[in-house]
UniProtKB/Swiss-Prot annotation:
Entry annotated with the keyword Cytoplasm: yes
Organism: Rhodospirillum centenum (strain ATCC 51521 / SW)
Protein name: Exodeoxyribonuclease 7 large subunit
Role according to the record: Bidirectionally degrades single-stranded DNA into large acid-insoluble oligonucleotides, which are then degraded further into small acid-soluble oligonucleotides.
Keywords per UniProt: Cytoplasm, Exonuclease, Hydrolase, Nuclease
Lineage, top ranks: Bacteria, Pseudomonadati, Pseudomonadota, Alphaproteobacteria, Rhodospirillales
Domain of life: Bacteria
Record's subcellular location: Cytoplasm
GO process annotations (BP): DNA catabolic process
Family recorded in the similarity comment: Belongs to the XseA family.
Reactions that this protein is recorded to catalyse: Exonucleolytic cleavage in either 5'- to 3'- or 3'- to 5'-direction to yield nucleoside 5'-phosphates
Gene it is expressed from: xseA
Gene Ontology MF terms in the entry: exodeoxyribonuclease VII activity; nucleic acid binding
Signal peptide: none
Length: 523
């Protein structure tokens, strides 16, 4: 016969002590912590969540149960594995309860992947996700510089890796190396490597610290767990975002990490990375010397070919001196004709100036005529004023006879005043008119002087006359032994012609017209 405990009558007056909810929760907490203490739990991570405070909350589950877990901020920063959804891990920590929600939970202190298979599965899933974002795309790869001036190396400062890289660079082509020391395994290694890559990219060109032209991220061989920092997402993203070309040299040739897919070039070993970074200096020198010899041979052959071609063309050309002789003769002929033309033009213009000087009046004559005209104009003006005064006086007298004496007298007095003022004004106007006429006469005299032959003589020319005083204007009008007179600006001297132009014949001589007395004769 079965029974239900609910069918039993309630116990009253029991000896069980009465407990509050808090007391019971604290008792359960002590019981659980005392009974289990540290435990090691294997399970699959579910719903991992990193709080803004830095703490990580997650669940560990298997086919039958779920266990709440928490990883405090200080421990989460030191974990060798970043918690991800679906990752199978083994966690070590303390089992405790959380009275606020009446649940028990695991306080994680260490976390590791549950076997290499689970680790590889996680890496493959991460690789697919990052590849889907395009971080491994071939078009993102940057070419390596042929000969970098500065090489940045991200590795441990105490390992054999940095010594191998420096030794190999010294053997091939010594370069300036900047070492950014980092931890290459263990807690915090991934963050240090990512910060080192970003730090090299943050160096400004031209600053006190030279900016690398190439970055090498290197580490020696190790187990899969040892190489895990180079599989971390932060390192992969830093390598993909690097503006400086990057070579990954992590592990041995058989080791592959996710940074190898994001880097611009993968080297199987750190030594191979140094070989990729720089060429062999001796090989370059040999190649340069060989190229120099080949270039010299090429230039020599080209020069010989061009020389032969030019010599062949030269043989087909005539003598350049023969080409120039005709040009020289034509040039001499043109020069002789130009000289003759200039001389003839100068003589023609000289004769024209002399004729103009003969036809011009003397300035004193022009000034006298202008003064006479001015005097006549003044006399006519005075006579006109006198006539006008007489006419007005007559009009005044006639009007005076018709008007009363007093107004007429006033008008007469005013008219007399105006009439008295007219002679001074007339004299002033006459004087101004004479001054203006005198100024014009002076200007005309200066103009006449500029056209006179005397001005020509003062500029250094000479007037030639024969014994009878007639001007000699052509060389053909002279004969050897003929006496001539040479008139300068300050006087006249005698001279005798010592020769005549070849082939010149005396031309018909014309008697110059008699110059006016006021202008003065040339002789």
């Amino acid at each position: 016969m079965s029974y239900d405990p609910a069918d039993l009558p309630p116990r009253t007056g029991s000896n069980l002590p009465e407990m509050s909810v808090g007391d019971l929760a604290r008792a359960l907490k002590r019981t659980v912590e005392d009974a289990y203490g540290y435990v090691r739990v294997r399970g699959e991570i579910s719903q991992p969540k990193r709080h803004s405070s830095g703490h990580v909350y997650l669940r560990l589950k298997d086919e039958t149960a779920v266990l709440e877990a928490v990883c405090w901020k200080g421990v989460a920063a030191r974990l060798s594995v970043r918690p991800e959804e679906g990752m199978e891990v083994v966690c070590t920590g303390r089992l405790t309860t959380y009275p606020g929600r009446s649940q028990y939970q695991l306080v994680i202190e260490t976390m590791e992947l549950a076997g290499e298979g689970a680790l590889l599965k996680m890496l493959e899933e991460r690789k697919r996700r990052l590849a889907a974002e395009g971080l491994f795309a071939p078009e993102r790869k940057k070419p390596l510089p042929f000969l970098p001036e500065v090489i940045g190396v991200v590795t441990s400062p105490t390992g054999a890796v940095i010594r191998d890289i420096l030794h190999r660079l010294a053997d091939r082509f010594p370069r300036h190396v900047l070492l950014w020391p980092v931890a290459v395994q263990g807690e915090g290694a991934a963050d240090q490597v990512a910060r080192a890559i970003a730090g090299f990219n943050a160096i400004a060109p031209g600053g006190p610290v030279p900016r690398p032209d190439l970055i090498i991220v290197a580490r020696g061989g190790g187990s899969l767990e040892d190489l895990m920092p180079f599989n971390e997402e932060a390192v992969v993203r830093a390598a993909a975002a690097s503006a400086i070309p990057l070579i990954s040299a992590v592990g041995h040739e058989t080791d592959t990490t996710l940074i190898d897919f994001a880097s611009d070039r993968r080297a199987p070993t750190p030594t191979a990375a140094a070989e990729m970074a720089v060429p062999v200096r001796t090989e370059l020198l040999a190649q340069v010397l060989d190229d120099g010899r080949r270039l010299h041979q090429c230039l020599s052959r080209a020069i010989d070919t061009r020389r032969s071609h030019v010599e062949g063309l030269g043989r087909g050309l005539g003598d350049p001196r023969a080409l120039l002789e005709g040009c020289i003769q034509r040039l001499d002929d043109r020069a002789e004709r130009l000289e003759l033309s200039l001389r003839t033009g100068l003589e023609r213009r000289h004769a024209a100036v002399q004729q103009l000087g003969i036809r011009l009046r003397h300035p004193r004559e022009v000034i006298g005529l202008a003064a006479a005209r001015a005097d006549a104009a003044g006399r006519a003006l005075r006579a006109g004023f006198d006539r006008a005064v007489t006419v007005e006086q007559g009009r005044f007298h006639r009007v005076a006879d018709r008007l009363s004496p007093l107004p007429l007298r006033r008008q007469i007095d005013a008219g007399r005043d105006r009439l008295d003022a007219l002679p001074p004004r007339l004299a002033q106007a006459h004087a101004r008119r004479l001054d203006q006429a005198g100024q014009r006469l002076v200007a005309l005299g200066q103009l006449l002087e500029s056209y006179s032959y005397k001005g020509v003589l003062e500029r250094g020319f000479v007037l030639v006359a024969d014994a009878e005083g007639r001007p000699v204007t052509r060389a053909a009008d002279t004969a050897p032994g003929q006496p001539v007179a040479l008139r300068f600006a300050d006087g006249t001297v005698g001279a005798v012609v010592d020769g005549a132009a070849p082939g010149a014949s005396p031309a018909a001589r014309t008697r110059a017209g008699k110059a006016k007395a006021d202008q003065g004769s040339l002789f």
